[in-house]
């Protein structure tokens, strides 16, 4: 999977879960500060990513995932 493909899919999930504009979901966007995501939003986002990519994301894998770019890295590592 290409990085842009993962970013586009994460953008789709973020727009649906967080009700943000697609243009605001960039690799540098921070989930809490820039996209106004709270902890429940982040849980829903992870569930959406797990379903979209058919992956499992243990809680410990989420440590350090603070930006959309970090989420792209995590997804790419999971789908290999």
Regions found by a protein language model. Give the residues of each.
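Residue-level recognition of specific faces of alpha-helices
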Residues: 9, 16, 39-45, 61-64
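Phosphopantetheine carrier-protein modules
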Residues: 17-36, 52-64
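C-terminal structural segments of small proteins and small subunits
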Residues: 59, 63-78
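Generic structural marker for isolated residues within well-ordered, non-membrane alpha-helices
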Residues: 11, 28, 46
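Thiotemplate assembly-line natural product biosynthesis machinery
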Residues: 1-23, 77-79
């Amino acid at each position: 999977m290409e990085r842009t493909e993962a970013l586009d899919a994460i953008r789709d999930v973020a727009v649906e879960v967080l009700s943000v504009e697609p243009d605001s979901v960039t690799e540098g966007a921070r989930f809490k500060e820039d996209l106004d995501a709270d902890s429940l939003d982040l849980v829903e986002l992870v569930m959406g990513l797990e379903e979209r990519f058919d992956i499992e994301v243990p809680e410990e894998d989420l440590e350090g995932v603070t930006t959309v770019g970090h989420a792209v890295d995590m997804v790419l590592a999971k789908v290999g």
